[in-house]
Amino acid sequence: MRIRVPATTANLGPGFDSCGLALTLYLTLDIGAEADSWYIEHNIGGGIPHDETNVIIETALNLAPNLTPHHLVMTCDIPPARGLGSSSAAVVAGIELANTLAELNLSKEEKVRIAAEIEGHPDNVAPAVLGNWVVGAKLDGEDFYVRHLFPDCALIAFIPKAELLTSESRGVLPDTLPFKEAVQASSIANVMIAAILRNDMTLAGEMMERDLWHEKYRSQLVPHLTQIRDVAKSQGAYAACLSGAGPTVLVFAPRNLANKLQTSLQTLEIDADVLLLDVEGSGAEVFR
């Protein structure tokens, strides 16, 4: 059996800790034969565990402690610590592993709830489970979210080789915002969401670049954001914004501009991968 979970981008600018979008990069987990102990082969390196302390296995065992150990093989296109939901993908893969092997028959809603409990909020895990675009909130321990189709557009991901830990990126954020600024930040997010629902990416893109919640604070850790935004806007893109906590920057553009933008971004003197992606519509899947 094979489990496949998509990457995700969170925030989309002003939709801070609320908006998430599934992307066509994947964590794939092949479930092999039963074994005496858990072992997970993977291509990530970097100190990622191969035993039951791996997040995937740990998550599965928390849900189903009596699972029979298996040999697992993970391949992952989602680079860690780049703002593309790698940790959320691992958590969701663990939930799917337990659900499959222990025949838990979890609903998608239950999977989102469990994953959001582990991750703290649903912005990455909800689209990882459900696919497409999700707007969500966690209030008094309860998850509220709406899944909707995202407008058709090109997505160009500028993924620096250097990592940026979410903990570091969150450390530069203020504890509070002045009331007037928070009201303005909320109104910007509201207009962005309404524009997306109306398939108006021009207006949505303008709001994406007017975020007041987090990007201006994180820009000191992601100095290439302004440079990428300038290139993108000069060539007709809708917007460029941080993917999650960064350092990846996601560019939204008309499809006919995708190749040109990719080429232009590849010429920047920054060590990075520049990938053409799409919205992933299915979310986590199990292939038997």
Curated annotation (Swiss-Prot):
List of residues binding ATP: P79, P80, A81, R82, G83, L84, G85, S86, S87, S88, A89
Protein name as it appears in the record: Homoserine kinase
Cysteines paired by S-S bonds: none
SUPFAM superfamilies linked to this entry: GHMP Kinase, C-terminal domain, Ribosomal protein S5 domain 2-like
Parts of the chain that traverse the membrane: none
Compartment list: Cytoplasm
Organism: Listeria monocytogenes serotype 4a (strain HCC23)
Pathway: Amino-acid biosynthesis; L-threonine biosynthesis; L-threonine from L-aspartate: step 4/5
Family that this chain belongs to: Belongs to the GHMP kinase family. Homoserine kinase subfamily.
Catalytically driven reaction(s): L-homoserine + ATP = O-phospho-L-homoserine + ADP + H(+)
GO CC annotations on file: cytoplasm
Source organism phylogeny: Bacteria, Bacillati, Bacillota, Bacilli, Bacillales
